[in-house]
Amino acid sequence: MARFMVERTFPDGLEIPPTEQGAQACMSVVGTNAELGVTWVHSYVTEDHKKTFCIYDAPSPDAIRNAAKLNQLPAEKITAVRVLDPYFYLAAEVR
């Protein structure tokens, strides 16, 4: 499964309340994604809540686009990414 970063813009800001309603909204997205083999790993949200950078595992960018459409979420840019972990290099020095 490939990993992707999805950039989304919310002109009015994204507000997900820390309530049961907010949890249900998130779990609805998770459920719809799962039907398409897409896993939402986590998201970064800008301070003004108008932009998110979401990390996903998915079979393809098209699967993410389809999930976004079903969830009525924007998906302006989808980029394949890989982890660059500085601690990996520290461990390599020890070997």
Place the predicted regions along the sequence by residue.
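Short alpha-helix boundary/capping motifs
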Residues: 23, 57-58
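An amphipathic, aromatic/His-enriched active-site/gating alpha helix that lines ligand/cofactor pockets
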Residues: 58-84
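Short S/T/G/P-rich N-terminal loop/turn motif that feeds into the first structured element of a domain
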Residues: 1-34, 39-41, 46, 50, ...
